[in-house]
From Swiss-Prot:
The gene is proS. One of its GO terms (biological process) is prolyl-tRNA aminoacylation. It comes from Rhodococcus erythropolis (strain PR4 / NBRC 100887). This is Proline--tRNA ligase. It holds the Pfam family HGTP_anticodon. Catalyzes the attachment of proline to tRNA(Pro) in a two-step reaction: proline is first activated by ATP to form Pro-AMP and then transferred to the acceptor end of tRNA(Pro). As ProRS can inadvertently accommodate and process non-cognate amino acids such as alanine and cysteine, to avoid such errors it has two additional distinct editing activities against alanine. One activity is designated as 'pretransfer' editing and involves the tRNA(Pro)-independent hydrolysis of activated Ala-AMP.
Length: 581
């Protein structure tokens, strides 16, 4: 196919859009691939849609290769199935909710586990029908509080979601591994640099969970890896290495001190190092207690105390993952007034437990560890409060930040952090949703058996931005051949009619050879055409210019920047060879 730029619906821009922060957003808008309609909502223009469709093609090919069958469910979903699974509430403000004219509740679907489970229930009733994997490429909706980075984090996005149904846990493991392998092939074909990390399941539920993260400094996800072993995990999924407990024998008794004007860890450490405690005190010797309120879906707010070493900050993503499906908020001045046993800046574990407040601690707070912490009175701290002797937590919680140099959970070395963009996620859901909807089929022995599910997602539209983020330079985009909007970008850089006819002839021959050609036949200067060719990012640029009179054609490699002249008579063979390798 030949696409003539003189006819193509395309307007390139010389300046970056004012709201663009990352390279992919800037370049996709400047190159005329997408246009913003509203915060987090974008239109796909012809070239952008081509790239999007190429990504879809690769995803479909690999899904079909593992036996997936494509269906399409509605994006407008009734409330009842999601009420049954409790996710109507669990998703909170992230859902787009609406009512029809009769007052019935609907939502724009962020995910489809419930509908897939009900679909299988409605069609299959025998063990002979299983295993089965269904998938769709569907528009999803999420009411992001702060849409950013163009199509990387929008309110409307295209996603491939697939669901496996097996009659045994062994079958689920096979389906999970098949999807995992398919995802590796997808991202490799798309030219994406990625890492697979252990993850949490969140509102999806289930057990085993891994994320595919595209390596990127602008990524919103922080992950850690152990260079010695290859262990990698999203920070939400990292399990703290628990130290050995310490015998109580010989530990001094706890003592309360007057510590006026020390409501922060820094001021407390300054006081301690001037109080002649017999050793140098650091923030790691202190135990800070953070107060939040939590609420299970449909439940009431409850106070929760969280104790972590004073040299660590709370990582809200880790806290959120640890508390799910409950939501949390930090307590307010009103909460302090309503609970006078909370001494702001001087909270300790004893008053919390004496007043029935659940108290969870960092896994490092093991029996025998001694802490400087609040004494539950304004201007007072206790020194030498020993876990397991002077206070007994109700459990542990992964809420403290993970830092470079922390011990790897596999014991092989230390952790280093990096950032990435989530492009895929695989879950072993188990029977969470088949239990909700009583999806039972007859087993070979004539008794009912309940299928177990896997859920697998790929961010299709996000991948376009990820590829742009990883494959660009200061001049513009550089699409991998697998997803490029064309195979060849042919520039007519000479006003001579003979050169124009030669370019038209080249384009026609390339078309007959099965190549996709963008032909820049506009009445614009060569400089404008060259800039647009680099901005648009087709991997091979062919220039019919001054050399045409001497029987020469120029070939430019958009990735390497290399340029060479070839004989016009052998240009077709050379171009086809360059495209197809």
């Amino acid at each position: 196919m030949i696409t003539r730029l003189s006819h193509l619906f395309l307007r390139t821009l010389r300046d970056d859009p004012s709201d663009a922060e990352v390279a992919s957003h800037k370049l996709l808008v400047r190159a005329g691939y997408v246009r913003r309609i509203a915060p987090g909502v974008y239109s796909w223009l012809p070239l952008g849609l081509r790239v999007l469709r190429e990504v879809e093609r690769v995803v479909r090919e690999e899904m079909n290769a593992i036996g997936g069958q494509e269906i399409l469910l509605p994006a407008l979903l009734p409330r009842d199935p999601y009420e049954a699974s409790n996710r109507w509430t669990e998703y909170g403000p992230n859902l787009f909710r609406l009512k029809d004219r009769k007052g019935n509740d609907y939502m724009l679907g962020p995910t489809h586990e419930e509908l897939f489970a009900l679909t299988v229930k409605g069609e299959y009733n025998s063990y002979k029908d299983f295993p089965v994997t269904l998938y769709q490429v569907q528009t999803k909706y999420r009411d992001e509080e702060r849409p950013r980075a163009g199509i990387l984090r929008g309110r409307e996005f295209l996603m491939k979601d697939s669901y496996s149904f097996d009659l045994s846990d062994e079958g689920l493991t096979e389906s999970y591994q098949a999807h995992r392998g398919a995802y590796e092939k997808i991202f490799t074909r798309l030219g994406v640099k990625y890492v697979i990390v252990s993850a949490t399941s969140g509102a999806m539920g289930g057990s085993a969970s891994e994320e595919f993260l595209a390596e990127s400094e602008i990524g919103e996800d922080t992950y850690v890896r152990c260079l010695e072993s290859g262990y990698a995990a999203n920070v939400e999924a990292v399990k703290t290495v628990v130290p050995d407990s310490i015998p109580f024998d010989g530990l001094p008794e706890a003592k309360v001190y007057d510590t006026a004007n020390t409501p922060t860890i820094d001021t407390l450490v300054d006081w301690a190092n001037g109080a002649d405690l017999g050793r140098t005190i650091t923030a790691a010797d202190t135990l800070k207690n953070i107060m939040v309120k939590t609420r299970l879906p449909g439940g009431e707010w409850e106070l929760l105390g969280i104790g972590i070493p004073g040299d660590r900050e709370v990582d809200e993503k880790r806290l959120e993952a640890s508390l799910e499906p409950a939501e949390f908020v930090m307590i307010t001045e009103t909460d302090f007034k309503n609970n006078p046993f909370l001494a702001k800046g001087y909270i300790g574990p004893k008053a919390l437990q004496a007043n029935g407040v659940r108290y969870l601690v960092d896994p490092r707070v093991v029996d025998g560890t001694s802490w400087i912490t609040g004494a539950d009175e304004d201007g007072k701290h206790v020194v030498g409060l020993v876990a397991g002797r002077d206070f007994t937590p109700d459990g542990t919680i992964e809420a403290a930040e993970v830092r470079d140099g922390d011990a790897s959970p596999d014991g092989a070395g230390t952790l280093v952090s990096a950032r990435g963009i989530e492009i895929g996620h695989v879950f072993q859901l188990g029977r969470k949703y088949t239990d909700v909807f009583t999806v039972d089929v007859l087993a070979e022995n004539g008794k009912p058996v309940r299928p177990t599910m896997g859920s697998y997602g790929v961010g299709v539209s996000r991948l376009v931005a990820v590829i742009a983020e990883q494959h660009h330079d200061e001049k513009g985009l550089r699409w991998p051949a697998e997803v490029s909007p064309a195979d060849v970008y042919l520039v007519i850089a000479n006003k001579d009619e003979t050169a124009r006819e030669g370019a038209e002839g080249l384009a026609a021959q390339l078309d007959r050879a099965g190549l996709e050609v963008i032909l820049d036949d506009r009445k614009a200067s060569p400089g404008v055409k060259f800039k647009d060719s680099e901005l648009i990012g087709v991997p091979l640029i062919v220039v019919v210019g001054r050399g045409w009179a001497d029987g020469k054609v120029e070939i430019r490699d958009r990735f390497t920047g290399e340029s060479r002249e070839i004989d016009a008579d052998s240009a077709i063979e050379a171009i086809i060879s360059a495209v197809r390798g």
